Design a protein with these regions (language model features):
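Glycine-rich phosphate-binding loop signature in dinucleotide/nucleotide-binding domains
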Residues: 94-99, 171-177
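A short, conserved alpha-helix within the catalytic core of class I
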Residues: 152, 163-166, 189-205
Length: 298
């Protein structure tokens, strides 16, 4: 696994916008064809990003962008959308059924769920990310909504060098209430030590807390099985050197148990596609190198 000095945190920070840009473009599809609904995503962008979002109102250009994405990274279009849809549903479920009133989003990027989901408006939330992403997002949210929601606290961090617990405590998160943790598209960008450090933090969560996270497959990161994703391996692992860590699906349940969590679901993107893409009638690829986990603190 990568050592501490080889982790390019700036490179990881630059990936925070793309998922939400894809979500914004998705809103230009007819309503019955959309994989996810998000009326805020497009409002976060200006300049060239907004230009590309706007021109995809033209169907031929919209389909061209989707097809180009799928050509280089099969499943690369739908992966952002289905995982966000899944997390949205688990969050709403946790708030309404499990009475969870606290949320921590580690690696929040430009994600909009805290600002668009009605169920999330009255919970106490902390969004944690690199300073450059936090600052840009605050400005974008203030511009889109007129002010920044008082129930959301933004927390800047370096996931490699800093302790999550200490940083959150300084911003008012005490960790004494059941919490919904989101760890979306973070683990591959850090090293094994930082992953374990994150789970050391998760292990202290109150019983009944929920955790949802994505992970890239270990054999892909190691180059043992590329799953038809040669371009992605060349770019993310070899060239840009921003993907460092992967989990083995056969070991994920034991790893969770060791850290005080019970696996609820470890799901691949083929099944997520059946849930969220198939009903739209669209035919999109499947990202076989990533999976989604949902767990409960025990």
């Amino acid at each position: 696994m990568a050592n501490k000095n080889s982790i390019k945190t700036k490179g990881a920070a630059k990936t925070g916008d793309q998922p939400t840009i894809n979500v914004a473009i998705e809103q230009n599809f007819p309503k019955e064809q959309r994989i996810i609904e998000d009326n805020l995503a497009a409002q976060l962008y200006s300049g060239m990003n907004r230009f590309w979002i706007n021109i995809t109102k033209i169907a031929i250009l919209r389909n061209w962008i989707v097809n180009i994405t799928e050509k280089f990274l099969p499943g690369g279009w739908s992966c952002f959308l289905v995982r966000k849809r899944y997390i949205d549903e688990r969050l709403i479920e946790s708030i309404t059924e499990n009475k969870i009133k606290t949320l921590v989003n580690l690696g929040a990027g430009s994600d909009t769920r805290l600002y668009r989901l009605s169920e999330a408006q009255n919970i106490s939330a902390w969004e944690v990310d690199q300073a450059v992403n936090i600052d840009a997002k605050r400005k974008a949210i203030e511009k889109a909504l007129g002010s920044f929601p008082s129930n959301v606290k933004q927390v800047s961090i370096n996931f490699i060098d800093e302790e999550i617990e200490d940083v959150l405590k300084r911003h008012g998160y005490l960790g004494n209430e059941k919490t919904f943790f989101i760890w979306e598209a973070v683990s591959q960008y850090i090293n094994e030590a930082a992953v374990q450090k994150t789970f050391d933090f998760f292990s202290k969560a109150p019983v009944g807390s929920r955790l949802v996270f994505t992970y890239v497959l270990k054999d892909f990161i190691k180059g043992e099985n590329l799953y038809g994703q040669e371009w992605g391996y060349e770019k993310f692992v070899l060239k840009d050197k921003i993907w460092h860590f992967g989990f083995d699906p056969n070991q994920i349940e034991a790893y969770l148990n060791k850290n005080g969590w019970k696996l609820i679901e470890d799901i691949d993107y083929a099944e997520l596609g059946d849930r969220y893409v198939k009903p739209t009638g669209r035919s999109l690829g499947v990202l076989d190198i990533e999976r989604m986990v949902y767990a409960e603190k025990i």
